[in-house]
Amino acid sequence: MSSPERKRKRVTSTKNPSVKKKKKISPVPTPIPSLPDDLLVSIFARVSRLYYPILSLVSKSFRSLLRSPELYETRSLLGRTESCLYLCLQEGNPDPNPLWFTLCMKPDRTLKNGKKKKKKKMSSGNLLIPIPVPNPPLEHWSGHASVGSDIYFFGGYMEENVRSSRVVILDCRSHTLREAPSLQMERSDPAASVIDGKIYVAGGVDGDDADSLYPIEVFDIKTQIWDHRPIPYWEKDWGALSRSAYVDGKFYLTIGMKVMAYDLEESRWDFAGYQMGQSWFWSCNCVIENVLYCYGDAFRWFDTKLRLWKVMKVKGLPKLSRNVDVKIADYGGKMAIFWDNPSPSASDTNKIIRCAVIALERPNSEEIWGTVEWHEAVLTVPVSYEFEHALAVTV
């Protein structure tokens, strides 16, 4: 029989049921405190536009502020404007509902055990996200030009083989459309270049319209008025106008395989030679800081003094297959490139779109080098989709 002392010890050694062990209480997330709109606008204006799609998921009020004119006015006053990339994909010819995407930062889902996973070399953490399709939809095969935060679209096909003279402006701050005065002629896939506050629109006509007095239409952005520029000694059998660019004070225009150059200061047209048109005509192209670039089987830039194309060496870019679709764009003084990876199997229903940003360096007047800052897969789409537009705006 146990002694009373042992019993007491047993009793005293038992835990008091009324005294419970404190449990670790995980902190309950608190709602975002209500801040004045003007303070939120000031905060958002200092954040990169790449994060806006993520911030817009927080609440309706955030979404409203992120699309407000006041936010972008504040960004401009603070000197926080930046380039923003857009990509348009189409399916079919014409496609009544093309898909529009913009580049943004991925939500950070790389946390594991409280630590970030190491990102792969050359990765940026970016991806393409869809933006609402504007209503009414944009015409297929329209020409385009970016001016500040706006993208101007000229002409295109309303339906198969029916050209349009419609001009539409996409406001990339709010992703809304507004109409502008129509072209004086119906055009499909015209070339457009921005020069000193005006947009020069050329091409997109053929047949009986090819020798019209309106081969080039000029739109004054400030007054919203159209004018035109005739091309002297243009012969109809030269071919169609298909490319344009403004470089070194001259407006270059391809007519078939010929290239004409218009000197704005002297108001004079000259032949620019055949060499310029050979690579330019069959490739995607863009102008970056007064230099014309193109990509066909290699990256090239045009030397206006020697009037010839030179190959640009690019360091760090994966080798592109010959059958890939490629688009290049001016991305704040750098080159952005989109390309699609060919499907390894004919049975594949999707393909991957990749993006790279290339920093450009000109060590002397005879060379330009490219160095890839990052490249990665940014979107997966059905194989039936093709590139239509790739460009950047300033927001």
Swiss-Prot record:
Pfam families named in the record: F-box, Kelch_FKB95
Biased composition, class Basic residues, residue ranges: 1-25
Keyword vocabulary terms for this entry: Kelch repeat, Repeat
Matches recorded under InterPro entries: F-box-like_dom_sf (IPR036047), F-box/kelch-repeat_ARATH (IPR050354), F-box_dom (IPR001810), Kelch-typ_b-propeller (IPR015915), Kelch_1 (IPR006652)
Swiss-Prot/TrEMBL Kelch repeat ranges: 150-197, 198-246
Chain spans, region Disordered: 1-29
All residue ranges annotated as the F-box domain in the record: 29-75
This protein's name: F-box/kelch-repeat protein At4g39570
Source organism: Arabidopsis thaliana
